[in-house]
Amino acid sequence: MTLPPLSHLDRLEAESIHILREVAAEFRAPVMLYSVGKDSSVLLHLLLKAFAPSRPPIPLLHIDTRWKFREMIAFRDRRAAETGVDLRVHINPDGVAQDVGPISHGAAVHTDIMKTQGLKQALEHGGFDAAIGGARRDEEKSRAKERVFSFRTARHRWDPKNQRPELWNLYNARTGPGESVRVFPLSNWTELDIWLYIYREKIPVVPLYFAAPRPVVERDGAWIMVDDARLPLRPGETPQLRSVRFRTLGCYPLTGAIDSDADTLEAVIAEMLVSTSSERQGRMIDHAPGASMEQKKLEGYF
């Protein structure tokens, strides 16, 4: 019997599903980080496929910084209700007590307290020994050298010089005392692969990825959306309606939009085919002094 050849997307899908099942089999208490972005949407779809028709044995964890786009939070809650997955939300109580935010405390402090420290708290409180994420190697140079099974110390730190070899599709899941693992099933996917798979599988994504007239101000070379009244306007700033969309999503004061008329999946894919810039160009935190992705990962960031 001759089987038809697998397409490029079929191979990526099969690899990711294999990794998800491997995590479920090898770890005591795995969890999947759900950031609500396009990669998380694909990962959730793969998780549902991997264990269908049963409910996935792996819960979802969202680290809420209190500054996500309102559409992201609404989409998160809607997808959790539609899929029936076990969604857990954690907000760093220390950050809430100090009222930490990107405006009052700056991008670096906000990201560290509300995201990095919040993530470490949630993993420790939940007793999770493996955290699945949607990071891809094509996103950023420090992620390009990370293993699929990325081992972290008891303090959640990543040591790029102390990782294990991965031969073919064989993964070493043995952890030492206090160690945990971050797992990246989408490591070998590209941004274009993600969008093509979303198109093929008809996966719902946050509407912010599609162009629409939105109120924005130009700040530090980026279009920042005025999502609510908490964003103070600087002298000379006046919100204007522009047709924009987002290639990446995070805390709204730290996420720049791009000018675009791509309001459909087909148009987004067509735009992707001719793009020459990084999808993370709109992440303001990546441009902050001393805030490289590798440094953040060394401190426990995903």
From Swiss-Prot:
Xref: InterPro entries: PAPS_reduct_dom, Rossmann-like_a/b/a_fold, SO4_adenylTrfase_ssu, Sulfate_adenylyltrnsfr_sub2
Pathway: Sulfur metabolism; hydrogen sulfide biosynthesis; sulfite from sulfate: step 1/3
GO molecular function, a single term: ATP binding
Catalytically driven reaction(s): sulfate + ATP + H(+) = adenosine 5'-phosphosulfate + diphosphate
Coiled coil (UniProt feature): none
Organism domain of life: Bacteria
Top enzyme category: transferase
CDD domains in alphabetical order: Sulfate_adenylyltransferase_2 (cd23946)
Enzyme Commission (EC) number: 2.7.7.4
GO process terms (BP): hydrogen sulfide biosynthetic process; sulfate assimilation
Key words, A-Z: ATP-binding, Nucleotide-binding, Nucleotidyltransferase, Transferase
Record note on quaternary structure: Heterodimer composed of CysD, the smaller subunit, and CysN.
HAMAP family: Sulf_adenylyltr_sub2 (MF_00064)
Similarity remark: Belongs to the PAPS reductase family. CysD subfamily.
UniProt function note: With CysN forms the ATP sulfurylase (ATPS) that catalyzes the adenylation of sulfate producing adenosine 5'-phosphosulfate (APS) and diphosphate, the first enzymatic step in sulfur assimilation pathway. APS synthesis involves the formation of a high-energy phosphoric-sulfuric acid anhydride bond driven by GTP hydrolysis by CysN coupled to ATP hydrolysis by CysD.
Protein name in UniProt: Sulfate adenylyltransferase subunit 2
Organism the protein comes from: Xanthomonas euvesicatoria pv. vesicatoria (strain 85-10) (Xanthomonas campestris pv. vesicatoria)
